Amino acid sequence: MKLHADKLDTQSVTAYGEGWIAVNGQRHTQSLVLASSGQLVPWTCTRFEDLTEAHFSMLASLMTEAPELVVFGSGSKLRFLPPALLRSLMGQRIGVDTMDTTAACRTYNILASEGRRVVAALLIET
């Protein structure tokens, strides 16, 4: 599916499909973290079952100012995280919204186009 963002001065998800996500037209086939402040970094996890607290604790440091919200894309289906994995983010009063990865792509684009401080952690399972 192709997506179009209203705000062009930030990274945005421009398309996605099974096993890939395109950010600003560039296709990615591995999990990634995308911040509305412009950062795009690989995320070192390939399976939901392998996620650790360390995967989430690094998300707050991507932006100069802490994000308001982390949108977590859990893969092809919605799966909720154990609260212990989110301890670091919750301790910093950063909200976490969990959804499947395609919904997370759409939600990230909407929030980023509104100028919100948002980070998307998008799991692409291999």
Give the residues covered by each predicted segment:
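Conserved phosphate-binding catalytic cores of ATP/NTP-utilizing and phosphoryl-transfer enzymes
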Residues: 107-113
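Short, charged beta->alpha transition segments
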Residues: 53-61, 107
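Short glycine-/small-residue-rich flexible loop motifs, especially phosphate/cofactor-binding loops
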Residues: 18, 83-86, 108
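Short active-site-adjacent helix-start/loop capping segments
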Residues: 42-43, 78-81, 107
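Mid-chain, well-packed structural core segment of small domains
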Residues: 59-98
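Short acidic loop-to-helix transition motifs that present clustered carboxylates
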Residues: 101-106
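General beta-strand structural signal in soluble alpha/beta enzymes
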Residues: 97-100, 120
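Non-catalytic interface/targeting segments
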Residues: 1-54, 113-126
